[in-house]
């Protein structure tokens, strides 16, 4: 899921 910004390592990467 790309709900988090690309630069945010705490977010999901799919």
Curated annotation (Swiss-Prot):
Q: Where in the cell is it found?
A: Host nucleus, Host nucleolus; Host cytoplasm; Secreted
Sequence motif: Cell attachment site, positions: 6-8
Asked if the record carries the keyword Transcription, the reply is yes
Q: Which GO terms describe its cellular component?
A: extracellular region; host cell cytoplasm; host cell nucleolus
This entry's Gene Ontology molecular function terms read:
metal ion binding; RNA binding
> Which keywords are on file for this protein?
Acetylation, Activator, AIDS, Apoptosis, Host cytoplasm, Host nucleus, Host-virus interaction, Metal-binding, Methylation, Phosphoprotein, RNA-binding, Secreted, Transcription, Transcription regulation, Ubl conjugation, Zinc
Task: Give the multimer and partner information.
Answer: Interacts with host CCNT1. Associates with the P-TEFb complex composed at least of Tat, P-TEFb (CDK9 and CCNT1), TAR RNA, RNA Pol II. Recruits the HATs CREBBP, TAF1/TFIID, EP300, PCAF and GCN5L2. Interacts with host KAT5/Tip60; this interaction targets the latter to degradation. Interacts with the host deacetylase SIRT1. Interacts with host capping enzyme RNGTT; this interaction stimulates RNGTT. Binds to host KDR, and to the host integrins ITGAV/ITGB3 and ITGA5/ITGB1. Interacts with host KPNB1/importin beta-1 without previous binding to KPNA1/importin alpha-1. Interacts with EIF2AK2.
What is the UniProt domain comment for this protein? Answer: The transactivation domain mediates the interaction with CCNT1, GCN5L2, and MDM2. The Arg-rich RNA-binding region binds the TAR RNA. This region also mediates the nuclear localization through direct binding to KPNB1 and is involved in Tat's transfer across cell membranes (protein transduction). The same region is required for the interaction with EP300, PCAF, EIF2AK2 and KDR.
Report what the protein is called.
Answer: Protein Tat
Q: What organism is recorded for this protein?
A: Human immunodeficiency virus type 1 group M subtype B (isolate WMJ22) (HIV-1)
